[in-house]
Amino acid sequence: FITAAFGIPQISTGDMLRAAIKAGTLLGLEAKKIIDEGGLVRDDIIIGMVKERIAQDDCKNGFLFDGFPRTLAQAEAMVEAGVDLDAVVEIDVPDSVIVDRMSGRRVHLASGRTYHVTYNPPKVEGKDDVTGEDLIQRDDDKEETVKKRLAVYHEQTEVLVDFYSKLEGEHAPK
């Protein structure tokens, strides 16, 4: 909705990383190992990818970050680069709900269609509605991986709420 209303692109580091993984790039292979273990890809890699992306023409009128920044270093790098944010939104969801939602997700790899075992189940359990092919659970959606990612979130990302609430001057979200 926001991207359509303002004619701006959504910038998702997750999507950028998944594209690199699918393409089998060196970054993609390195990122896959880290993501599958529930960790965060190194800040320097993410910051570089984001700076490259926001320099593209379609970002000249703005952009919507999705899942970025995730660490204090990433947020500070954006401030140092003069990237001003109009608003920052935190969606506060209990860990138990996140685990349930993510671990219940199933994907048809060829098409990208996404289902959920409880909230959006396929017509036939474990099968894509269109092709009848198998659905898979991505490694990063497995319960133990989701719990590790949440621990990383609480350790590294939660501090951003405080960072942005204290940011002042021209770089402060309005």
UniProtKB/Swiss-Prot annotation:
GO MF: adenylate kinase activity; ATP binding
Binding residues for ATP: 105, 114-115
Keywords: ATP-binding, Cytoplasm, Kinase, Nucleotide biosynthesis, Nucleotide-binding, Transferase
Subcellular locations according to the entry: Cytoplasm
Predominant subcellular localization, coarse grouping: cytoplasm
Protein's GO biological process: AMP salvage
Recorded GO CC terms: cytoplasm
Residues that coordinate or bind AMP: 13, 18, 39-41, 67-70, 74, 138, 149
Short name of any one Pfam family annotated for the protein: ADK_lid
Stated family: Belongs to the adenylate kinase family.
Function of the protein: Catalyzes the reversible transfer of the terminal phosphate group between ATP and AMP. Plays an important role in cellular energy homeostasis and in adenine nucleotide metabolism.
Subunit structure: Monomer.
Protein name per UniProt: Adenylate kinase
Taxonomic lineage of the native organism: Bacteria, Pseudomonadati, Pseudomonadota, Betaproteobacteria, Neisseriales
Gene encoding the protein: adk
